[in-house]
Design a protein with these regions (language model features):
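Noncatalytic, beta-rich nucleic-acid-contacting surfaces in large DNA/RNA-processing enzymes
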Residues: 1-609
Length: 609
């Protein structure tokens, strides 16, 4: 906070400046929302929290570190938008501050931030420098014993032969549908396992013992994203340990939240790095190009997604998502938002109805006309948590905070609260100044049917704020793929250098797109994939046994001493840089010397000598 200002005056000034920049002209309704949020944040005592997040996001942007448009419910906040923490206009997409900070339920705010995965640590380092190493710490996380691991660990302690234990462990169902399966579930689902359990006393003892251990902590590690920032040294509040010279809180994240400590997630998102790399390549021809300036309604981009050309597009490239794109034929970021929200276990069942209603408006029905302005954007289907909140507000007169409390109860299946609220939804609650549907002119039977539908869907409804953020990134990646295919695919290939399956997939996609792939070249390649007039040039990092340090030395030598004139010249100039025979042979076999004229077989023979 600058000298002469309080936290409250400073955040208001920053928000007013951001508001003026984002909304040119009079927007009284929007400004009222900003004032309301600032008052609420001040009353709840979270002003400093927002200033801290705003500060490290500002640092990231000024340092050229890619920052995501937002993540989670924080994108529903006008304050977050005006401070530059998020890039999503909450008013444009109908998002609610109360879904993020609920005045009816005071809890710590939770702003998670996405940064480019290769530079995320720079932001955490900035926070350490700003507040002091002893005021910032990572968070411990415990890996727990899953069903199979528990069987194997217990079998080892019981001195059972590994092969016998392995046979038992492999009877526990695995795969995506068996994630977090318990041994009780496994005994119910796997007949061979049940037969072993019933027939062999030793195996019964093995599984019973494993049952008592599953879910227990097995090992400690550091949480991938969580960081705690404290006013006094962290050791004042929690026990600490060191992991690779980094301070780590010995309490898990939920305990830290219960203690009221300030916890933040700094997440690395590979796709932000891809976009940033693609932008840098485009700027070599168009220096003024900015990602923020791309149009949000490019029909050619949506046509590409409709055609199923989704490989490399954030969130959309799985076979299932591609199928939804082809069926839905998205025409807007709102449509992409719905796809992100619906493609999950549970809501997936309503995708066919959603698609049918989009293409045939006659199929769209509303139990009451008051639902149309709320559900028309999703063709009559309840998709978002924000829609559940709005139904309670508009039809029954709940405040947004009260409505979110009911939505939370429904998502957590708190039946007693759900049944109690049913009466209030229908007939009101004078104590909380809720009028109820009947008093608002909605027939009793209709109101009952609406409540039943909300109850059925609320468990699966998705946070629209988060879906919008990821839909925007999905659209940006699709836009780049369509308009700057070589730059985008080069950046994409560089981002998956450690994943041979993805490299193969994206090389195939390049060929389908008619993009030529050029071999590595000691005189033209850099570390990652790069764009040339003829196509995309392989990066040297893609060549096995070639370290990044050696590549940087090669590039420096090439830039200072000129292009390599032949294999002998290369060997002489790179001799002092720890070049080994294996590395040079791999460069030869990858074609990195082809442009110098000699045949690969000849160079391999020379290299062997």
């Amino acid at each position: 906070v600058p000298e002469g200002e309080t936290a409250q005056s400073y955040i208001r000034r920053l928000c007013e400046e951001g508001f003026a920049e984002k909304y040119r002209g009079e927007k009284p309704e929007y400004h009222n929302q900003l004032d309301y949020e600032l008052d609420m944040i001040e009353k709840m005592g979270f002003t400093d929290y927002f200033l801290i997040v705003s500060d490290f996001v500002r640092f990231a942007r000024e340092a050229g570190i890619p920052v995501g448009p937002g993540r989670g419910s924080a994108a529903g906040s006008m304050v977050s938008y005006c401070l530059g923490i998020t890039d999503i206009d909450p008013m444009q997409y109908g998002l609610y501050f109360e879904r993020f900070l609920n005045p009816e339920r005071v809890s710590m705010p939770d702003i998670d931030m996405d940064f480019g995965d290769t530079r995320r640590d720079e932001v955490i380092d900035y926070v350490r420098r700003k507040y002091g190493d002893d005021h910032v710490a990572n968070i411990v996380t415990f890996g727990t014993m899953a069903a199979r691991a528990a069987i194997r660990d217990v079998g080892r302690v019981m001195n059972m032969p590994y092969a016998d234990v392995d046979v038992v462990a492999k009877q526990v169902p695995s795969g995506p549908g068996a994630l977090h399966i318990t041994l009780d579930d496994a005994l119910r689902l796997s007949k061979p396992l049940r037969d072993m359990y019933d027939a062999d006393p030793q195996i019964k003892k093995l599984i019973d013992t494993a049952k008592s251990l599953e879910g227990m902590p097995r090992h400690a590690s550091t949480h991938a994203a969580g960081v705690v920032i404290t006013r006094d040294p962290v050791v004042t509040y929690v026990p600490l340990a060191k992991n690779d010279e980094t301070l780590v809180c010995q309490y898990v994240m939920t305990t830290l939240e219960e203690l009221g400590l300030l916890k933040m997630d700094f997440l690395g998102l590979r796709n932000l790095t891809v976009l940033d790399d693609a932008v840098k390549m485009v700027r070599r021809q168009k220096p003024d190009f900015r990602l923020e300036d791309i149009p949000e309604d490019d029909q050619d981009v949506f046509d590409m997604l409709t055609a199923g050309k989704t490989s490399g597009v954030f969130q959309m490239e799985s076979a299932g998502m591609t199928g939804v794109c082809v069926g839905l034929k998205p025409q807007s970021i709102e449509d992409l938002t719905a796809i992100v929200a619906l493609y999950r276990p549970g809501p997936m069942d309503s995708i066919p109805r959603f698609i049918a209603c989009k293409h045939d408006p006659k199929l769209v029905t509303y139990k009451h006309p008051a639902l149309e302005p709320i559900l028309s954007i999703t063709y009559g289907c309840i998709v978002y948590q924000e829609q559940v909140i709005e139904i309670f507000r508009r039809l029954a007169g709940y405040s947004l905070g009260q409505a979110d409390m009911v939505r939370r109860a429904m998502s957590k299946k708190k039946r007693s609260q759900i049944e109690r609220e049913r009466q209030f939804f229908l007939y009101g609650d004078p104590e909380r100044q809720i009028a109820g549907c009947v008093a608002n002119g909605i027939p009793e039977e209709t109101a009952k049917a609406i409540y039943e539908e909300i109850d059925a869907f609320a468990e699966y409804a998705f946070n629209k704020a988060h879906a919008v953020c990821y839909a925007v990134v999905a659209y940006q990646t699709a836009w780049f793929k369509y308009h700057y295919p070589r730059e985008y695919m080069a950046a994409l290939l560089t981002s998956v250098l450690d994943n041979s399956d993805k490299i193969s997939e994206y090389i195939g996609e390049c060929r389908d797109m008619g993009i030529a792939l050029l071999p590595p070249d000691t005189n033209r390649s850099r570390d990652g994939f790069t764009v040339e007039s003829e196509g995309i040039r392989f990066g040297l990092v893609a060549v096995k046994n070639i370290g990044r340090g050696f590549i940087q030395n090669l590039i420096r030598e090439r830039e200072s001493g000129g292009p390599f004139t032949g294999f002998q010249d290369f060997c002489q100039r790179m001799y002092d840089y720890d070049m080994n025979k294996r590395a040079s042979e791999n460069l030869i076999r990858a074609g990195a010397f082809d442009s110098l004229g000699a045949k690969r077989s000849q160079l391999v023979a020379v290299n062997d000598k």
